[in-house]
UniProtKB/Swiss-Prot annotation:
Descriptive protein name: dITP/XTP pyrophosphatase
GO annotation, biological process: nucleotide metabolic process; purine nucleoside triphosphate catabolic process
Cofactor descriptive note: Binds 1 Mg(2+) ion per subunit.
Catalytic activity, as annotated: XTP + H2O = XMP + diphosphate + H(+); dITP + H2O = dIMP + diphosphate + H(+); ITP + H2O = IMP + diphosphate + H(+)
Necessary cofactors: Mg(2+)
Subunit structure: Homodimer.
Transmembrane segments: none
NCBIfam families cross-referenced by the UniProt entry: RdgB/HAM1 family non-canonical purine NTP pyrophosphatase
Swiss-Prot/TrEMBL keywords: Hydrolase, Magnesium, Metal-binding, Nucleotide metabolism, Nucleotide-binding
Entries under Pfam families matching the protein: Ham1p_like (PF01725)
Superkingdom: Bacteria
Enzyme Commission number: 3.6.1.66
Length: 194
């Protein structure tokens, strides 16, 4: 295990995933464990919000920090929910409600287009110093009603391009091999270690 890296999250459940995706090269501690406040996400892009959160955690902790911002963008909804993906689930993080909202908004459009994409932006920032930012994306199609109980968020309504199963139906290892987050982490590892 290497140097400490702050995961700019208050969700300790993310630590094992982050550690695994970074091949165990860092000792991961969360912003929540350090008592750091969460910044307001005021940027208009996934990259902007990831960078804001990473810089905030790095500057307050004095340690390098990793942050992510991710979400679902729907072509027929002009990219919505986008950076507001989690907010569409409301304060209770009810993604059944969020998926219903996506379906209702699509029904209000005149479009039959059900294409969508997941984006994950990752940023690593050093205290008062440089930062590395990468983005991963996976394209697909939305299906209603949702299918499957695996994963989280919008996974039950998203079928990745070239596949028949939703992320919610896939074995976790299959989803993880192609997800937007895995693609972003592959780019991040290349930027940091190659």
């Amino acid at each position: 295990m290497g140097a400490k890296l702050v995961a700019a999250t208050h969700n300790p459940g993310k630590v094992p995933e982050i550690a695994a995706l970074l091949d165990g090269r860092f000792e991961i501690v969360t912003a929540g464990q350090l008592g750091l406040p969460e910044p307001d996400e005021t940027e208009s892009t996934f990259v902007g919000n990831a960078l804001l959160k990473a810089r905030h955690a790095a500057d307050l902790s004095g340690l390098p920090a990793l942050a992510d911002d991710s979400g679902l963008s729907v072509t027929a909804l002009d990219g919505a929910p986008g950076i507001f993906s989690a907010r569409w689930a409301g304060p209770g993080k009810d993604f059944a409600l969020a998926m219903k909202k996506v379906e209702e908004r699509l029904e209000e459009t005149a479009s039959d287009d059900r294409t969508a994409w997941f984006t994950s932006a990752l940023a690593v920032a050093w205290p008062n110093g440089p930062a590395v930012v990468v983005e991963g994306r996976v394209d697909g199609t939305l299906v209603f009603p949702g299918r499957g109980t695996r994963g989280f968020g919008y996974d039950p309504i998203f079928v990745p391009e070239g596949h028949a199963l939703t992320f919610g139906e896939m074995e976790p290892a299959a989803k993880d091999a192609m997800s937007h987050r895995a693609r972003a982490f592959a780019k991040l590892k290349a930027a940091l270690f190659d």
